[in-house]
């Protein structure tokens, strides 16, 4: 998808939240890493 289309699709009142919206697709990856770190801390039981 075109980046300009994604940025223009966000309504103006929500322009302040644009950086958060840009990070949102990576959140599931953080949960995957969190699960790995958690299992490493408990010794992969």
Curated annotation (Swiss-Prot):
Query: What positions belong to the pro-peptide in this record?
Result: 1-8
Keywords linked to the UniProt accession: Chloroplast, Membrane, Photosynthesis, Photosystem II, Plastid, Reaction center, Thylakoid, Transmembrane, Transmembrane helix
What Gene Ontology biological process does one annotation of this record name? Answer: photosynthesis
Q: Name one GO cellular component term.
A: photosystem II reaction center
Lineage: superkingdom: Eukaryota
Q: Where in the cell is it found?
A: Plastid, Chloroplast thylakoid membrane
**Subunit structure, briefly?**
PSII is composed of 1 copy each of membrane proteins PsbA, PsbB, PsbC, PsbD, PsbE, PsbF, PsbH, PsbI, PsbJ, PsbK, PsbL, PsbM, PsbT, PsbX, PsbY, PsbZ, Psb30/Ycf12, at least 3 peripheral proteins of the oxygen-evolving complex and a large number of cofactors. It forms dimeric complexes.
Q: What is this protein called?
A: Photosystem II reaction center protein K
């Amino acid at each position: 998808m075109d980046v300009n289309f994604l940025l223009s699709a966000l309504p103006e009142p929500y322009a302040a939240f644009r950086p958060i919206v840009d990070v949102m697709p990576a959140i599931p990856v953080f949960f995957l890493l969190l699960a790995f770190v958690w299992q490493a801390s408990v010794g992969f039981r």
